[in-house]
Amino acid sequence: MGAMFNGLLFFPITPYRSDGEVDLAELAAHVRRGVDAGAGGVFVACGTGEFSALEPGEYAEVVRTAVEAIAGRVPVFGGAGGPVRTARRFADRAKDAGADGVLLLPPYLTEASGPGLVGYVREATREDLSAIVYNRANARFNEDSAVAVARLPQVIGFKDGAGDLDMMSRIVRAVRDEGTNPSFLFFNGMPTAEVTQRAYRAIGVPLYSSAAFAFAPRVALAYYDALERDDLATLEALERSFYHPLARLRAKGAGYAVALIKAGVELVGHSSGGVRPPLTEVTSAHRDELARILAAGLAALPEQVAAR
């Protein structure tokens, strides 16, 4: 079992119509644009896709729409999480909608021990559907619990959103040394992951999610290509002009990890429909700042990329 990812990972937004309902036609166009641009995998209805704001029927439609739009070109994963039985129902809906797997988000408003987290993963996932476990917020794994979930046949990967490089380095080593699954995958799931990806790559985490890809695919792909080529000059130019300013802007508003991406999609001429509560819209001043950051990132592209 397992889906193979080849390239940058795309986390689409969930667009809404003017009446507040999910805009499935715009979603299909959004994910097709991303795959056409070069995404190597699509994670729909996850954090950037406002999983927490979708009711189960909407979620199923979102996943099914993405699966049909992509038509097998790259793997499609849906989000799942919350209370353990609710998470399992979302996994069931993802399976029924044709997804290749789920990204398992943390349980709802509770602290848990390592064994408790392992139990959550076991009961929230399906043995016939690939799962990637998300280490963040109240779902913080250590070496022992990470090794235990890596032994579950349906768990193909581990994604870190905690940012503890010390612990993540030890988790990577522990899972690799344990050896149950040599093809087990590790992902950087930090907000604006490009800011930390050089550090994650150095400890054995080659895959990462790019929220910025949703509105700046040329910048995101140029950065990814520079990583693959060890092109330090391009990496530093894009970090200086685009990624570090974007991370600083993200820190200016609660929920901006999602709201900024939707604002960026609007900036490049596509509909997003805004965000659902409790998220709030980007201020007009911050929207202008985002436009300047995007322009600077495009201006910093290598000549051969800018000419495309």
Predicted regions and their residues:
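Active-site beta->alpha loop and helix N-cap motifs at the rims of alpha/beta catalytic domains
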Residues: 2-140, 146, 280
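C-terminal alpha-helical cap/extension of soluble enzyme domains
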Residues: 9-15, 37-38, 202-212, 216-308
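Short helix-capping segments at alpha-helix termini
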Residues: 68-74, 97-98, 127-129, 151-154, ...
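Glycine-rich phosphate-binding "P-loop"
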Residues: 131, 155, 276
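Catalytic alpha/beta core domains of metabolic enzymes, predominantly
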Residues: 137-246, 250-254
